[in-house]
Regions:
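Short amphipathic alpha-helical surface micro-motifs
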Residues: 31-32, 42-45, 143-148, 159-161
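Histidine (H) residue identity feature
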Residues: 75-77, 113, 170
Length: 187
């Protein structure tokens, strides 16, 4: 899967714009892919990555990037898995800096508002700088993520802070239907 290693995390390995794959012939077992449409379709329906051809294009392309799991799963495609994995690595590295550091608290043992906002902004900035700015997240006004920390968490009693990070993935046009007809005025 050399293509996966050479493209950004949000990119689908089957993107037609990236061009065809290098092999000039591909096989499923001993049969050419071109002659095994039913077998290829059956394998694809089970959630496996398979090659395909397009009318009007030369060469082979990956049909999509499924993960061989329930198609409704959030991580049913390699694109989403790679995006969330990268966000996880950035969040881990960013929040690790805060581990065992002193935290200014309110009288009830909760984090002070300014500390919460600082942590939220630090993580959002890291994700936006390393992912959103590179086009790896779908964004509005440069923001491709949202971080939330509940200020009511009692750090003194639990020594634990739960941080919620949500990233906005891209969508993919897996199907395009064109409604074609004549444009004529009724006489």
């Amino acid at each position: 899967m050399g293509r996966i290693a050479s493209i950004p995390v949000q990119r689908n390995i089957g993107r037609v714009k990236d061009g065809s794959l290098f092999p000039t012939e591909m096989f499923i077992g001993t049969s050419k892919v071109d002659e095994s449409a039913n077998v290829v379709a059956s394998i694809f329906e089970k959630g496996y990555i398979v090659p395909r051809k397009y009318v009007g294009r030369s060469g082979y392309f990956w049909a999509d990037d499924p993960m061989a799991c329930d198609p409704t799963d959030d991580y049913a495609h390699i694109t989403n898995r790679r995006v969330i994995d990268k966000a996880y690595r950035i969040a881990y590295d960013t929040m690790l800096e805060e581990l065992l550091d002193e935290i200014d608290l309110n009288e009830d043992g909760t984090m002070q508002h300014a500390v919460v906002k600082s942590w939220q902004q630090t993580l959002e900035n890291a994700i936006n700088r390393q992912m959103t700015a590179n086009g790896e997240l779908s964004a509005t006004d440069g923001e491709g993520c949202q971080v939330y920390i509940d200020e009511k968490q009692n750090v003194v009693s639990t020594s634990k802070i739960v941080v919620t990070l949500k990233v906005r993935p891209h969508g993919y046009s897996r199907y395009v239907d064109v409604n074609l007809g004549f444009q004529v005025a009724n006489a």
